[in-house]
Amino acid sequence: MEYKNTLLMPKTEFPMRGNLPKREPAMQEKWAEMNIYEKVQEHTKGRPLFVLHDGPPYANGDIHMGHALNKVLKDFIVRYKSMTGFCAPYVPGWDTHGLPIEQALTNKGVKRKEMTVAEFRKLCAEYAYEQVERQREQFKRLGVRADWDNPYITLEPAYEAQQIKVFGDMAKKGYIYKGQKPVYWSPTSESALAEAEIEYQDKKSASIYVAFPVKDGKNVLEGDEKYIIWTTTPWTLPANLGISVHPELEYAIVKVNDEKYIIASELFETVAKTLEWENAEVVKTVKGSELEYTVAKHPFYDRDSLVMLGDHVTTDAGTGCVHTAPGHGEDDFIVGKKYGLEVLCPVDDKGVLTEEAPGFEGLFYDKANKPITEKLEEVGALLKLTFITHSYPHDWRTKKPIIFRATAQWFASIEAFRKELLEAVAETKWVPAWGETRLHNMVRDRGDWCISRQRAWGVPIPVFYAENGDPIITDETINHVADLFREHGSNVWFEREAKDLLPEGFTHQGSPNGEFRKETDIMDVWFDSGSSHQAVLEERDDLQRPADLYLEGSDQYRGWFNSSLSTAVAVTGKAPYKGVLSHGFVLDGEGRKMSKSIGNIVVPKKIMDQLGGDILRLWVSSVDYQSDVRISDDILKQVAEVYRKIRNTFRFLLGNLDDFKPSENTVAVAELREVDRYMLVKLNDLITKVKEAYETYDFAAVYHAIHNFCTIDLSSFYLDFAKDILYIEGANHEDRRAIQTVLYDVLVALTKLVTPILPHTADEVWPYIPGVTEESVQLTDMPEAVQLDGAEALKTKWDAFMTLRDDVLKALEVARNEKVIGKSLNASITLYPTAEMKAMLESINEDLKQLFIVSEYKLGGMMEEAPADAPKYEHTAVVVAQATGETCERCWVVSETIGKDAEHETLCERCATVVKENYVK
């Protein structure tokens, strides 16, 4: 007889190798055929809603690792919620207006100057839709379950119509106004920028100290002094109309040779050192407030420079006398307004100086620095010129420096509802908790929001102007424009004349001749995506406002979290979200930012093509995503190893359940052995721990708990000793069916627990599980932890056994290394435990030699009675020797019963019995 044919070895068609790059697309096709998204929505219909609102990625180019991290995190949450009593719809979105799309078309050779704005915008829309399609397929390849056929796209007519309504509501409440103000201006984009569209990079700038002679000392100064200002933007000096001093600071009149200079007293030493003054002495001090309304002369123009008081003046750097150009700085503008100065801005849209800067007209602002500095030197006003490298705002899209420039713009008045904004921040749940402080400070400190852009591709600002210049924004005009956009899209604004965009028969007292013109600026793209709570959450039947969660990268505190909050509070008085969760950025393996120049960019597509989507998803679950995270080939290799371990665990479980029918073979819990019940207690602990981790969005805890359970509880213990029963005993042996009962519970629970993270693998495992009826594991609920009778006592006892078992394993390892034994089944062990452990061992009814995977087990005396040379551990001394007898051909146990049965000379007594009872006819 071939005894190997009498072993019940694992049998399953579940493949050992994942081959995910090939298998996942097939699984995704299956999901598409069965309409998995709709099926899940149908299955969870009527449950409480959980809405995670998708912040729209920008529709341009392939998805990057930041996109992958973001979408996968969202998918974890949505999948988990739909398996725990919620209906969790997930509607993906795209942000589709803005400069990058205009630039992409220009780079493709589109000559926008040769076509109308409406024609150019049509090309922008086509390009945006192509990009949406491209990204949609890549997101689907990640295994993200979403309503991919019905996303929201910010350029769609229905969306734009709602955005117009949001603008109209804000205008009606008096929150929208037009004003001349310095705004961030990008000469390369030829447009105003919002704070969220700037980034700081190092820039080399001229650093100059300039003397402004006193013209009128107002009896405080003698008239022969000079104010010293410091600036790193010489090009703004043609726009200088004043000097600001702090009312509370003390100012010194410093005599240096034959000159007298005015600077803040506490900066005397610093300035003296910088300007290399020798023999400088302070001849007089005055308070800043006394210098108000004194007048200085502009260094190279025949005009006055008024001395004003400003709280923005600091002594961190410079001289305490601040060059003030109301057309080129927010503080300058505020102070200038208070003192009635004009807003002079001699720089055009392209960053070129105009005729209002005589002598420098036609020069690009940055190129004007040198001639202006030379002019200062020529007139004797330049006291010092050096160059410094400092952090300076840049256009986040063109990566070029920006300027402050006063222009006529449309603004949303944050000041008008700042208090409500701060209250809304306080009522929101923030994860991490520091998010609250971050957004609170941003809202507290931000100025009014410049919402107009001088570009073509975006949603038009729905404002008309009467003949007398009055802006027109009424309920009637807003509703009419919204209806037009809903029907024709926003391009209608650029295709029709103003009068054809107004309601029929519309009149206005400012237009006696019935003539009107329309605004040509468009809205900031942050106003687009920031209106999604109205256009998506409020409008779609399957969603609701406020959303339960917004989840984006930490750059969105100043972006989408902020703009959404502003429009929602302005319109509804409430935040659009109950909770906000943020994640960090993806860096390379060395913690460096990914960039083309370094060549360290990791692309999601490459990972999916080489390793598979589930490996990428498992990586997402393994990192502390609330901070910046790292990815590299080595890191992915480690993750792939963990995946292999999880997959092998599934395969082992399936293989050993091949002949198990849950309806017939399940053993009641009360009839299970203690060790089997202990495994169920461990499983229940796992279920509790994993669900708690999912609830708190701690996916790394899910990853570690599942990995440890597969490795430590199953592989190293339960599955290891269980082989001796599963393979060796007869099919229906009670111990074998007991273990299979536990393995079945473990398999079903484990498959469900990994589903949010490894959906492809979980759905691959599912149909192989005996007795399951659901079409997909996604149509099931998370397992419930069951409280077993006496669980605590059982856990205490068997945890103690496990610590003792660790001691035994160490002793066996030593014996192996010393060549006392080959493998552990060659061993005979005698234990000399502590009193406590002895009592515990004596209370175990299971076959201890099976649990220790040895051929002989004896309980000796107490620890102190152990032979002197026996290795002693914390809980026991262990004597390891060769087991006596011969090795059984079938079970590999060393036994003195080999050959007792003459018909089966090479088998031990146990195996001979099993063979006779089950295989001999």
Curated annotation (Swiss-Prot):
EC number: 6.1.1.5
Disulfide bonds: none
Cofactor note: Binds 1 zinc ion per subunit.
Residues binding ATP: K596
Keyword annotations of the record: Aminoacyl-tRNA synthetase, ATP-binding, Cytoplasm, Ligase, Metal-binding, Nucleotide-binding, Protein biosynthesis, Zinc
Reactions catalysed: tRNA(Ile) + L-isoleucine + ATP = L-isoleucyl-tRNA(Ile) + AMP + diphosphate
One Pfam assignment: tRNA-synt_1
Magnesium in keyword set: no
One of the protein's GO biological processes: isoleucyl-tRNA aminoacylation
Binding site for Zn(2+): C888, C891, C908, C911
One GO term describing the cellular component: cytosol
The protein's required cofactors: Zn(2+)
Binding site for L-isoleucyl-5'-AMP: E552
Lineage top rank: taxon: Bacteria
The protein's enzyme class: ligase
Ranges spanned by the short sequence motif 'KMSKS' region, renumbered to the chain: 593-597
Function field: Catalyzes the attachment of isoleucine to tRNA(Ile). As IleRS can inadvertently accommodate and process structurally similar amino acids such as valine, to avoid such errors it has two additional distinct tRNA(Ile)-dependent editing activities. One activity is designated as 'pretransfer' editing and involves the hydrolysis of activated Val-AMP. The other activity is designated 'posttransfer' editing and involves deacylation of mischarged Val-tRNA(Ile).
Family: Belongs to the class-I aminoacyl-tRNA synthetase family. IleS type 1 subfamily.
Comment field on protein domains: IleRS has two distinct active sites: one for aminoacylation and one for editing. The misactivated valine is translocated from the active site to the editing site, which sterically excludes the correctly activated isoleucine. The single editing site contains two valyl binding pockets, one specific for each substrate (Val-AMP or Val-tRNA(Ile)).
Complexes and interactors: Monomer.
Name of this protein: Isoleucine--tRNA ligase 1
Source taxonomy: Bacteria, Bacillati, Bacillota, Bacilli, Bacillales
Gene from which this protein is expressed: ileS1
